[in-house]
Amino acid sequence: MMSREASIGIDGVYYNPAGVVFLGDGHHLSINWQLAYQDRTIENDYSLFTNNVNNPITPREFKGKAFAPVVPSFQYAYNKGRWSFQGNFALTGGGGKCTFDNGLGSFERIVAETAMAACGLARTVDGALGSVLGREVSMFGSDQAFGAGGKYSYNSYMHGRQYYFGLSLGAAYKVSDNFSVFGGVRGIYATTNYYGYVQDIKVGYMPLYMVLDPTKKDAANIELSCDQNGIGFTPIIGVDFKTGKWNFSAKYEFKTRMRLKNKSVNLVPSIGNLPANLSSQMTQILTAQFTQAGLPAEQAAAKAEAAATAVLANQTVQKTMLGLKNQFDTELDEAIGEYADGKKIAADIPAYLSVGVGYSPIDPLRINVGFHFFDDKNAKAYNNRQEKLDHGTLEYNAGVEYDINKKFTVSAGWQSTNYGLPEEEATTSKDKRFMDDKSFVTSSNSVGLGGVWHFNKKMSFTVAYFHTFYQHKKTTESVELMPGNAINYTADYSRNNNVFAAGIDINF
């Protein structure tokens, strides 16, 4: 049964620890396994994507696949008299592993906008060079170089892994035959890894590395390789009250302060080398042209160097190069700045309140409802991202469990999750935007089915399946490529999730 907040059972070590004390004296153990499979899909619509020579369509779908074949957990309780001593180990957070074989839309957007900016710079440089030489020039804007339309190609990949391992220890005390309390703590070890790249970038027919560092074919590559680790502790308290056919419970987990330390080996292009390499290329090409025109080699080289120097001194060229550098650096920082080596990243786990009510109208039938609140807006995240949420996460659930006979029990349940995501329209400012295609959530509804086979009074075997129906979250951003010329970049986020589970409960 998905709604377990008010249930009395060994899984209450996690859901309702105060209620576990109402189990009989002795040892209680539950060993569980889950298999999870998830698709994450972002559909991006951006007119510049039609400039991708290998896939000139928009909207474009970027799909990630996450598969976790083994997600283990165990719960243990030793009950003696009025006391219950408990322990729990589980993956308490993180999204498992997810791979985007073709990268992300945010990565392609950087390439597409850089291609347009590079073509703009090529036109500016060619114009300035033409003024210096007194004739029309098409050196960088020709079809054999960057071209004029912003055409591009690239290869990209993204893989992420997040695991939050939690070990909880605590004790419950039976104040009376109807009322119990719990106190405990959970230690959490977080480990994550992100690896991705954007490489082999071409603008028109020219590899981008040629104007950054012609001696290094990876000079224009973007590569992210970051490991993160952190430790946190969560105090936990709970209460349970039972009367007649009713049971009431509540649990509160305090906010967990978590700081993830980055250990990264990232590769980023240096746009700062652009002027020197443009000068070198212009000098080489012009020297060859002047030599072919009959100038002695030494005079040709001097004239070519003087022309290149004059072009780079042109204020319009300098302004255009600075604009390209600032645009690229800003977009790169937004994409991977969070993963810079040595940074400590705020990643608090929010305070969590759960409340449950259980009712058993007849002995074989149990009906539960529950409520969860995650105080996300007060859990510090990178760049205070949490402040952009409308509210913390709200969850409502309900479930029913029925004993067919002494051997078999069946159950069904439902849960609704609302993440408090803000609306992101074209006019929404950048500092108010929350969604990020590297790690995102959308509100959802989940349904689950379960069954129990009671071998005997000491042992039971459980199986379950649940599916999550995720909503679509759509965002729109207005992108001004040049003054007075804005186009929209839209994203449609969604997921698809399936989980199978099995476990064994033992009393001894």
Segments and roles (model prediction):
Residues M1-F100, S106, A112-T114, A118-C119:
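N-terminal, post-signal peptide beta-strand-biased segments of exported outer-membrane/organellar beta-barrel
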Residues S3, I8, V71, A77-F508:
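Outer-membrane beta-barrel porins/channels
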